[in-house]
Amino acid sequence: MSPFRASILLLAGALCSLPANAQQAGWSYSPLPGEGDRAAIGCGLESTPEIFACVAVRCEDDFSTGVHIYTSRPQSDAGRWAITVDKETRSFDAEAAAPYGARLVGDFSWVLHNLANGAVAYLEPEDGSPMPDNHIALDGSLYAINRALALCAPRNPPPVEPIGTPSV
């Protein structure tokens, strides 16, 4: 192989191995630094690195499950949100939280279940502020969410050596 071809192959391999640093349509691991496989993120069909509407399901530091809203809106993502999955809408409060814009608070089990098992989701801030395209297809969401939440599975405590009685 010529040195020119070898250098082209090395360059192509290096470019392909770079991490994704943008929000893209569909479900995948979170591209945010430090998140890795602890979070699954689903973004709107027309999402770009500059304009996006995403929802993330994350294994939190305390091994609980968190649902986060992450958008490119100039306003904060904290506030009250109407979340529609398969033509059923419910409202939820979200408080500012890192590394995404806001984390849902209260009972969000309906959101988690429907993100994993639904067909399409929409996010709408109840204050009426404009949103980027927020048609989030849920194809592949079950697989992505289950992989991320595997980190939240209960851990077995280290085995304890039995203490025998002195008379044995």
Language model: regions and residue ranges:
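Bacterial N-terminal signal peptides
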Residues: S7-S17
